[in-house]
Amino acid sequence: MARTDQKPPCRGGCWGQPGHPNTGGAAAHPTYHPMGHRPRTCILLRGDQTTGGQAPSREISLGPWAAGTHFLAISTTPWGRKTPACISELPTSSGTAQPLANAVCEVQTVPGPGLRPQGTPAMRAPSHKGTPPTPNPWGPEQPQNRHKHPKKGVTGGPSPPPPAASRYGQTPGREPRVQAPGLGPCGRPASGRLLSLHLEKGDGKGTRQRIPLTDAAVGGDRTDIPSAIAAGPARTPDRHGLPIPGSTPTPMVGSGRLGAPVGRSGGGASARSSRPSCANVLLRADASLGTVLSVLWTGQLSRGWALLPPGDAGRHLETSVISAGVAAGIWLVEPGEAAQDPATRRTAPPRRTASPEPPAPGAPLPACPGRIPGAARFGPRSCPLGSPAVLAVTTGWSHRSV
């Protein structure tokens, strides 16, 4: 019998599709998870900074205008903790607004500091049961008497000096933690630039080939995702600005520094807020990469939710009042609100009762994000995953069902 690396079937699937726990349908198609994690039902609504997010305690409706529209929930979290990065499809199939509490998220654990470099295999920690003892890094034990003094006339050899790792406060016998190239102390990026994002595709021969996503996977946007992210915010490899409509690149709103762990400050791009950053974005499933970058790379999302309504209103989302840092909730941005002067975006939060025009009755629905053709598996090896833009791309378009 031929062996396969396919993981066991994952619970979940698209909401309203077979296999979802709320539908009672047949088992969903098995989903391949590179990290071996199984999806859990959760939605990051409040952006909790202690646990990485909690399920909502109340149901928040999208409104009747969202009926029949697929949405892609992308949750971004700060760097430095094992935090769930959620992606979920939220199709609303009836005229009644469906709550976000019923959405299913595909959860992947975001590794903290000390990411493995590209090509380094993952090593499973050995069990403490039945393992041979670790050799004493301080040399052979010296014979002692009952007073714990060396016995007279017995030599056990000179004691070697302590290893270099021990002299710097590291546990003797432990290997130093391997950090990805380009990461500074505590696993943060050594500079304001982001490391390259590798989107990998298995060719069936045990090797993985790095490929950019196709146009179909990014909604027609032709930006090369790995190159654009590797070049840093708002820069392409040839140092030209990215097509961010009507925006000026600004640092990510977050704790003291971009990429610092929760409650700490450190190297990286400076930020404006003293609280940790957690941006939860609800995008349409067919949103282009340019729309995502225009929202996330400008650093306008501080805390809470932002919703890109149907139409082009979301393209000018960065000029709205999102950076006010309002408490958790869904921010529905109307076209009129999205065109406000950037100078007033910190004064008042947007209204949460927007009702944009409903989608056309005969308009085709976008494909399920989990089944986008051309989407590749994601192996978090050299991507810092501390940037909302990186998380949006990796959780949004590098996930596929097989």
UniProtKB/Swiss-Prot annotation:
Extent of Low complexity compositional bias: 345-355
Sequence segments annotated as region (Disordered): 1-29, 109-255, 337-371
Domain of life assignment: Eukaryota
Annotated protein name in UniProt: Proline-rich protein 25
Bias (Pro residues): 356-367
Designated gene of the protein: PRR25
